[in-house]
Amino acid sequence: MPNTNKKMRVALSAWEIGRVNSGLGAKIGGLGVVVEELPRELVKAAAKQHIDLEIETLSPCFAYHDKNKLTKLDLLVPVTLAGHTFEFEIYEHVFPDGHKVVYFWDHGQLHWTTPSAIYPTAPQVGLKLYSAVSQAMAGYIKQGDFETIHLHDYHVGLIPFYLGDDYLQKVPVHLTIHNATYQGIVALIGGGYKSLERINLPGEQLFHKYFDFFDNLNLMKACMLKVHETGGKITTVSGDLAGTWGYAAELKQSQQEVLAQATAQKGAPPGEVFLPNRCLDLFEKLPIAGITNGMSDRNRPENLPELKAEVLKTMSIFMNPVTQFEMLARDHNFDVHNLPIKTELKRLLHLEAFGTEPLLDPILITAVGRLVEQKNLGLVADIIERTLVYDAGTKFLILASAPEGDGSGKASEERFARLAATYPQRVYVNNSFNLPLSKLIMAGGDFSLIPSRFEPCGLVDYEASLLGNIVIGRATGGLTKVAHCAYLYEWLDISDRVGEANAFFAQMKTAIDTYRHHPVRHQELMRTAMAIDAGWDASATQYVNMYRYGLLMKQWHAERHELIQKFIKALKEDQQMFAEFFMPARQEYGDYLDWELQKTLQQRNLI
């Protein structure tokens, strides 16, 4: 039978695409994880709706990418910065899973990049780079036959402006915000108009309407406005479509709302609060939808590669000979019906960390991550000693390190090291990256500590929960999706570290008490966590529906335009008189169609 499925082509633009093992990708954080997994999940979800979805992921070509593995296209795209025009080279590669990635390369812009450094630290350098790559991507997109553009974060947020209004009238553009803390805020040089003109945009036309943010450029603000104006959808990575919970709800909170909430928590005015939207009140005014990211089923304990002996044999792994032997001797995958294997993993983890067989029933409390401000893992050091006193069977296993140049993170790293030296049989600290060990810690641990300052998506809570490692953390952003099977504390005053540590420790005590005195309840909680549906099916379906919605919005915009033109034509000789009296109401009393009508009348010089 002939294929009657509808075809749809999507260009998905992002600065990180994952696929680091291929040497042709980039992953600094969760963005790379999501962009790697999302395309194939979208294709599957679209097929269920009888849509043949073709996705091309657009990525910068970083200097460490092996261009010999890429296919160079017979296409050069001109880019202009500060009046100087040069050309980007374009490459493509089809990965074994069938997914196509298009790469954009210019030596002058990208020669400095490394696997751990793909974002410029200087805002002005970043502005030029993001502008250049966005111009190149827009030039490529306009030469294709894409029906939808899906942007990920502000780094590619200039693309709609380089596509131009004529293109945007026909093709919907959507924006997914993975982290609103970083908005592309850049100081002006020579004023707003000149700052935009240097990146090949008409400053007088665009600056005040889209980019102006307290006398800075704000790339995220500009992209949000343009996407909304042209009928696209703005989404973020946790919450529901109505934005009633998760990161979508947090971004809508005003400073006054956050301050009031913080005051209620501590019974006194806070010293300082962290604002998820960074005072960009556009988040409070535009509809922000949440589409909660999923995870590949490979992260479930029954599938996790790092619990398979054959996989571990190819990796640098464990220090303890018993742990090494046992992990290589057989697979240790498990599920909710095979929890004795998790108990064995707990034993092997204890051997690896402390070199001895566990006595009685220790509680293994784990933390895996980066010692950076966002993750707030330094707070764990504040509660270790009081936890050791509270329950003599508690032990901590910390796998975390600070980036070079992060003074606060390095101080936390040193503090953890001192605690490990003071309590060698109760505190284990490792500051080197070890993937198999990180998975063993997750799989063998009882509790996972996640006191994040903010967590837009929160994949780490899924990762821990699926392995029966119950989360103890802060109720923020995407972490709230596991609230039904976790111990979450609420705290917003980031200046009151003692108060936050007390709130954190209160949840720690509750978790320990449940483990010790209510084992049935703990087992129920663990089984609930392991049964979480963390897959991509629901999320991918919502993204596909968003693409369909965008096409329908274009249809509505076209019909609305036709309606206005028809009405103006019907006015005949009364056009001038009507225009003199016509003035749409503002704010909540205004009608969007009225404003569109006024805009058209102005274009005809009737107002």
Task: Describe every region a protein language model picked out.
Residues 2-579, 583, 587-595, 605:
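Catalytic cores of nucleotide-sugar-dependent glycosyltransferases that transfer UDP/GDP/TDP-activated
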